[in-house]
Amino acid sequence: MKQSSNVPAFLSKLWTLVEETHTNEFITWSQNGQSFLVLDEQRFAKEILPKYFKHNNMASFVRQLNMYGFRKVVHIDSGIVKQERDGPVEFQHPYFKQGQDDLLENIKRKVSSSKPEENKIRQEDLTKIISSAQKVQIKQETIESRLSELKSENESLWKEVSELRAKHAQQQQVIRKIVQFIVTLVQNNQLVSLKRKRPLLLNTNGAQKKNLFQHIVKEPTDNHHHKVPHSRTEGLKPRERISDDIIIYDVTDDNADEENIPVIPETNEDVISDPSNCSQYPDIVIVEDDNEDEYAPVIQSGEQNEPARESLSSGSDGSSPLMSSAVQLNGSSSLTSEDPVTMMDSILNDNINLLGKVELLDYLDSIDCSLEDFQAMLSGRQFSIDPDLLVDLFTSSVQMNPTDYINNTKSENKGLETTKNNVVQPVSEEGRKSKSKPDKQLIQYTAFPLLAFLDGNPASSVEQASTTASSEVLSSVDKPIEVDELLDSSLDPEPTQSKLVRLEPLTEAEASEATLFYLCELAPAPLDSDMPLLDS
C-alpha cells in the first residue's frame, strides 16, 4: 500500500491488518471485496488489537470505524435477523475496497456540523427573531390595554343605557299615570275643585247667567211710596218673554202687618217696571229665617193665574231704620228635579253661612284640606283606566272652541242685563210703616276677588260688570234706555281667564274679626247702626 500523508493512521493500520495473510483467521475481506469481516471478536480483541492500536477494547475499535463512516452490515435470512455474538461482523465503506487503496484519501473523519460562521449567522437570526417577538409582545400589550379600555367603556355605556332605560320606564309610568288621571276625570266628568257648594237657580228654563255679587242697599226711610201698577200696560215696555228669573221677597214684619200687604198677581210672562223705579230699587232678594218659613210666599214661574204675595219691609219710624238681610242668588242655571222650596232654603242657608265669622273660618279650612287631599291624591293614588278611553279622549268630537266660550259669555251677559230690567216691586205704604226685626242686618256685599275666582269669574270682570250694571240702572232715571240697547251693550265681554290664587292658612292674629271682614270686604257694623245708602 502506498503511504500517503492524506490517509489517517487508523485507516492505514486497518488496511494493513486486512491485507496481511497471517491475520486472515481473525479479519479478512469479504467474498466480493466490498467489505471486511471480523471472524472472532474476542480473540481479535485479545490478540490483534493490542499489537496495532494499543488497546484491546472492541467497542473502541467499532467507535473509530463509525467515526470514519464505516457501517455495520446486517444479514437478513428469511426475514429473521441473526444475532450471533461469536459470529463474524461485517463492516463496509464505499471507499474501503479490496485492491483500491487510493480511495482511502476520500475517507474523512466525521467532524461537528456546526461552524463558527454558521453560529454567528444563527445568532443574528436569533436576535432578529427575539426583536420581532418583543415587538409582537409590545403590540399585544397595547392591544390588551386597548381592549381593557374598550371593555370598561362598554361596561360604562351599558350601565348608562340601563339607567336611561330605567329613567325612561319611570317617565313612561308617570306619564301613563297622568294620562290615566286625566282620562278618569274626563270619564267621570269631574274637575278638581275646592269643594265650594254653588247654589242652583230656581229657574230651569232661563239662559245661563254670570255670577255677580249685587250691591244690597238699605231701603229709604222717607214717606215716599211706590205702588205697583196692576195693569200690564202701565209703565211697561212691550216686549216678548225675556227671562224667567224669580225675585223672592222675605216677609220681615209681624203676621198682623203681613195681612195688609197687597197681593200682586203674576202671570207666565215677566213684568218690566218703569225705569225710574228700577234705578231706586235694584234687584233684591230678601231671605226669611227658618222659623218663618211657613209664612214665606213663593212665586213660581210657568204657572198662570196663580197669585202670590210679595212685599218689602221698611222701618216704622225714623229712630230705628229697617235693616233687612238681602242676598242675591247666584245666577247659574241647571236642570234639577228637587222641590223648589227645599232647594231655595238650602241655597239661601248656604249664602247666609258664608257671611258668618265661624263659617268663614271653616270654609277657609276646608279649602286648605281640599288642596292637601288633592296633593296626596296626586302623589299616592293609583288609577286604573280602560285603554279604549284614550281613543275617546283624543278623538272626542265634543270639544269646546274659544268661540263657543265667547258665545256662552255673551248669553250670560244677556241674561244679566235682562235681570236688571225685570220687574222690581216698590215698597208699599203699609210695608214702610211695619216694625223692623232686630235680628235683620243690611249688608253691602261687594265683589270679592277670591270668591269670584271660585265661581269661575275673574275679579276684574265681576267688578266691571257690577259697576256697569249700577251705572246703567242709575242713568235710567234721567234718560230711558231701550231694552235692546241695554242688551247690546253687554255683547262684547272679555273672555274669562283663569287666575291662580294661593291660599295660606290664617293665624290667630290674622283670624281676627276686623281682618276677616276686611278680606271679605264686609263692614262689621252693629245691628242698630245706619248703613250708607247708594244715591237713588
From Swiss-Prot:
Cited PROSITE patterns: HSF_DOMAIN (PS00434)
Pfam families membership: HSF_DNA-bind, Vert_HS_TF
Protein family per UniProt: Belongs to the HSF family.
Lineage per the UniProt record: Eukaryota, Metazoa, Chordata, Craniata, Vertebrata
Gene Ontology biological-process entries: positive regulation of transcription by RNA polymerase II; spermatogenesis
Assembly with partners or alone: DNA-binding homotrimer in stressed or heat shocked cells, otherwise found as a homodimer.
UniProt feature, compositional bias: Low complexity: 311-325
Subcellular location: Cytoplasm; Nucleus
PANTHER family, alphabetized: HEAT SHOCK FACTOR PROTEIN 2, HEAT SHOCK TRANSCRIPTION FACTOR
Classification via InterPro entries: HSF_DNA-bd (IPR000232), Vert_HSTF_C (IPR010542), WH-like_DNA-bd_sf (IPR036388), WH_DNA-bd_sf (IPR036390)
The protein's name: Heat shock factor protein 2
Hydrophobic repeat HR-C: annotated span: 360-385
Superkingdom per UniProt: Eukaryota
DNA-binding region: 7-112
The entry's keywords: Activator, Cytoplasm, DNA-binding, Isopeptide bond, Nucleus, Stress response, Transcription, Transcription regulation, Ubl conjugation
